């Protein structure tokens, strides 16, 4: 693959994208790599990743990584984006808490009913044992 047949993917140079603005890197200037590929400046709003062989899988992974980085930057810089998500999560959490409280109340009610039935069963067993003890051995 030569510089002339480059498929158009934008790549980033290690030095220009990873050095902070105060380190003397030229800002807002489109550069190029050694083989002539375009390189965005370090303070560019887009972050792109280089693909080695240009396979469809690498291109898709590069695009996904770039989109994820852009989304992460957008979330960090746009707090208004987070507030509806936080309130939505809080309302879902509140709804879950309400459902859990209702389930715990039902469980408590069922536990009380089970205790009543267990006591009745114990009473019946005692009555059966008393009847067996009071009846003659061959009367059955």
UniProtKB/Swiss-Prot annotation:
Coiled-coil region(s): 100-127
Major localization class: virion
Query: What does the record note about the induction of this protein?
Result: Expressed in the intermediate phase of the viral replicative cycle.
Instruction: Look up keyword Phosphoprotein and say if it applies.
Output: yes
Task: List localization entries.
Answer: Virion; Host nucleus
Q: Which UniProt keywords apply?
A: Capsid decoration protein, Capsid protein, Coiled coil, Host nucleus, Host-virus interaction, Phosphoprotein, Virion, Virus entry into host cell
Q: Which GO cellular component terms, listed alphabetically, does the Swiss-Prot or TrEMBL entry include?
A: host cell nucleus; viral capsid, decoration
Q: What does the entry give for GO biological process?
A: symbiont entry into host cell; uncoating of virus
- Source domain of life is Viruses
Q: Which Pfam families match?
A: Adeno_PIX
Q: Phosphoserine (modified residue): where?
A: 135
Q: What is known of its domains?
A: Three N-terminal domains of hexon-interlacing protein form triskelions between hexon capsomers.
- Comment field (misc): This protein is only encoded by mastadenoviruses, and may therefore play a role in mammals tropism.
Oligomeric state and interaction partners are given as:
Homotrimer. Interacts with hexon protein; this interaction tethers the hexons together. Self-interacts with adjacent proteins. Interacts with kinesin light chain KLC1; this interaction leads to capsid disruption at the nuclear pore complex during virus entry into host cell.
The function of this protein is: Structural component of the virion that forms triskelion structures consisting of three molecules that stabilize three hexon trimers at the center of each icosahedral facet and fixes the peripentonal hexons. Dispensable for assembly. During virus entry, recruits the anterograde motor kinesin-1 to the capsid docked at the nuclear pore complex thereby subjecting the docked capsid to a pulling force. The resulting tension leads to capsid disruption, dispersion of capsid fragments toward cell periphery and eventually viral DNA entry into the host nucleus.
Can you name this protein?
A: Hexon-interlacing protein
Source organism of the structure:
Human adenovirus C serotype 2
């Amino acid at each position: 693959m030569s510089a002339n047949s480059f498929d158009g993917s934008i790549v980033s140079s290690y030095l220009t994208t990873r050095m902070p603005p105060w380190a003397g890197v030229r800002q807002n200037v489109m550069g190029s790599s050694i083989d002539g590929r375009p390189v965005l400046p370090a303070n560019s709003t887009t972050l792109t990743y280089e693909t080695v062989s240009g396979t469809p899988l690498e291109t898709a992974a590069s695009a996904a990584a770039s989109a994820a980085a852009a989304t992460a930057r957008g979330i960090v810089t746009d707090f208004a984006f987070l507030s509806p998500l936080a309130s939505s999560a809080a309302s879902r959490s509140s709804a879950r808490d309400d459902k859990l409280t209702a389930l715990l109340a039902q469980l408590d009610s069922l536990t009380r009913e089970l205790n009543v039935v267990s006591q009745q069963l114990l009473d019946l067993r005692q009555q059966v044992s008393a009847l067996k003890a009071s009846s003659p051995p061959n009367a059955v």
